[in-house]
């Protein structure tokens, strides 16, 4: 087989032509196409019986993480056409051709942030800071859910409260489906559907709930965990993929609050 030639045509809403690295090929950006032939890749000039090989190229999907660069239902497609000639026994060239297509759907980026505050949020918190052994101090937990390119359905956030942490039953805003199971110590926020491109918009999903900690004398000098690791799950409505995001455990170290001072997190006698 002689005069092999490969054409890879790139397309899709997430295709970023500036990011293409064609490897040994020639990138025709005006046509969104990469070409390999015997000039760019000498091994394509003459292909012996049983021989095989590979070519490589790369590209990065468009940035669709913010509403400033929206890409609805991002997808990518690569159409590959291969042409060559085969010499018959009579030395007459015979044209050969083959093609393949690969399409990809790109999932949304579903994200969760979790923080604890004292002076911010919808509730008035009480108790001493730093927290004292066998005395109750309240804190406000804030969960935020954001999403990028595709609508997400069935989103849900879950976390466990330790035995020494109490649920005060104060939640905000009204209408968010958040509950606490006193038997298991689990807090569940049934977020439901999350719109595309919520970052820095009014569509960002946010919930507050209040907890109270009553440390034991055995926790003096420690920085107790108040909310265990938190997990967000949801289903990408475009790709069908199950998405997950996690946030680390929250402690009495509420340094994201402007009122926080060094030493405020450690349990005092």
Q: How should these model regions be labeled?
A:
Residues 1-7, 123-158:
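Short beta-strand elements of extracellular/lumenal beta-sandwich folds
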Residues 5, 33, 52-56, 99-101, ...:
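Intrinsic-disorder/low-complexity, polar/charged segments enriched in Ser/Thr/Lys/Arg/Asp/Glu/Gln
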Residues 1, 14, 63-65, 145-150, ...:
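Short, acidic/polar linear motifs in exposed loop/turn regions
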Residues 2-42, 115-119, 153-197, 254-267:
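A surface/secretory-pathway sequence property marking extracellular, secreted
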Residues 19, 65-126, 166-172, 176, ...:
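Extracellular/luminal low-complexity Ser/Thr/Pro-rich, glycosylation-prone repeat/linker regions
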Residues 38-75, 83-88, 142-144, 190-239:
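Low-complexity, intrinsically disordered segments enriched in Ser/Thr together with acidic residues
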Residues 29, 48-52, 69-73, 105-107, ...:
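Surface-exposed coil/turn segments at beta-strand junctions on protein surfaces, enriched
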Residues 1-2, 7-24, 29-49, 54-60, ...:
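...the same signal can extend to comparable exposed beta-sheet modules
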């Amino acid at each position: 087989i002689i005069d092999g030639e490969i054409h890879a045509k790139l397309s899709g809403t997430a295709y970023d032509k500036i990011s293409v690295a064609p490897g040994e090929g020639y990138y025709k950006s005006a046509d969104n196409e990469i070409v390999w032939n015997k000039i760019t890749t000498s091994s394509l000039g003459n292909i012996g019986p049983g021989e095989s090989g590979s070519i490589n190229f790369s590209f990065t999907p468009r940035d669709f993480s913010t509403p400033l660069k929206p890409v609805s239902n991002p997808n990518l497609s690569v159409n590959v056409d291969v042409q060559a000639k085969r010499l018959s026994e009579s030395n007459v060239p015979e044209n050969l051709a083959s093609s393949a297509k690969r399409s990809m759907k790109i999932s949304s980026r579903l994200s969760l942030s979790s923080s604890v505050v004292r002076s911010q949020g919808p509730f008035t918190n009480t108790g001493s800071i730093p927290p004292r052994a066998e005395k109750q101090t309240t804190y406000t937990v804030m969960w935020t859910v954001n999403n990028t390119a595709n609508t997400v359905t069935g989103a849900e956030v879950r976390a466990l409260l330790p035995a020494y942490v109490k649920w005060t039953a104060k939640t905000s805003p009204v209408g968010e489906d958040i509950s606490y199971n006193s038997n298991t110590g689990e807090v569940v926020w049934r977020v439901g559907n999350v719109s595309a491109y919520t970052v820095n918009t009014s569509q960002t999903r946010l919930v507050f709930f209040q907890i109270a900690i009553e440390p034991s004398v055995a926790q003096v000098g420690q920085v107790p965990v108040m909310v265990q690791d938190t997990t967000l799950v949801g289903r990408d409505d475009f790709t069908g993929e199950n998405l997950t995001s996690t946030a680390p455990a929250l402690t009495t170290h509420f340094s994201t609050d402007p009122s926080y001072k060094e030493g405020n997190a450690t349990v005092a006698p």
